[in-house]
């Protein structure tokens, strides 16, 4: 199953980008052994519209346009469901085992996500109750993708 990340906003060069790249690279190398591969990390510029609702609508349109047909869509939102690492790995494994070909994880912009995306989403998850800047969210989700691969493969990286 191909897993991609869609993010509103671009990471500038620096330690955050380097750390996210390190975990995406680990995921890309380890994932194929358990049937998961990194499709792409798509970054789009934040909308320049003058109001938040229009910005969210425009960003949602870019996301929907980038989705492969039949892609699973997981939104990251502070009001989403909190999963521990094992449950996240299980969720990915379950989509893989159902024969799903593509999965996209979406990180919204500063204004959040357009309401229309929640109807289209297969799941809405949070990375805790706190609000995180998108630079850190990328690192967190990249690490959790790598951790999910290690859990699914029985690798000792994930220790409880």
UniProtKB/Swiss-Prot annotation:
Gene3D superfamilies with a match to the protein in the record: 3.40.1280.10
Keywords, in A-Z order: Cytoplasm, Methyltransferase, rRNA processing, S-adenosyl-L-methionine, Transferase
Catalytic activity: pseudouridine(1915) in 23S rRNA + S-adenosyl-L-methionine = N(3)-methylpseudouridine(1915) in 23S rRNA + S-adenosyl-L-homocysteine + H(+)
Record-given protein name: Ribosomal RNA large subunit methyltransferase H
GO cellular component: cytoplasm
Family as reported in the entry's similarity comment: Belongs to the RNA methyltransferase RlmH family.
UniProt xrefs under HAMAP family: 23SrRNA_methyltr_H
Domain of life: Bacteria
Subcellular location: Cytoplasm
Gene, per the UniProt record: rlmH
GO molecular function list: rRNA (pseudouridine-N3-)-methyltransferase activity
Pfam family membership, one: SPOUT_MTase
This protein's record includes keyword Cell inner membrane: no
Its biological purpose: Specifically methylates the pseudouridine at position 1915 (m3Psi1915) in 23S rRNA.
E.C. designation(s): 2.1.1.177
UniProt KW Methyltransferase keyword: yes
Listed NCBIfam families: PRK00103.2-3
Annotated binding of S-adenosyl-L-methionine, by residue: 76, 108, 127-132
Chief location: cytoplasm
Complexes and interactors: Homodimer.
């Amino acid at each position: 199953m191909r897993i991609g990340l869609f993010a509103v906003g671009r990471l500038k060069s620096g330690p955050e980008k380097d750390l996210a790249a390190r975990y995406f690279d680990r995921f890309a190398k380890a994932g194929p052994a358990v049937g998961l591969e990194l499709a792409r990390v798509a970054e789009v510029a934040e909308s320049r519209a003058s109001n938040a609702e229009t910005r969210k609508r425009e960003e949602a349109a870019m996301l929907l346009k980038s989705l492969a047909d039949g892609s699973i869509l997981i939104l990251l939102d502070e009001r989403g469901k909190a999963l521990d690492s094992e449950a996240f790995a299980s969720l990915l494994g379950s989509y893989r085992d159902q024969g799903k070909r593509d999965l996209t994880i979406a990180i919204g912009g500063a204004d959040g996500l357009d309401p229309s995306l929640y109807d289209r989403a297969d799941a809405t998850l949070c990375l805790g109750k706190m609000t995180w800047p998108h630079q850190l969210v990328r690192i967190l989700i990249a690490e959790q993708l790598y951790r999910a691969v290690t859990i699914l493969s029985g690798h000792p990286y994930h220790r409880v």
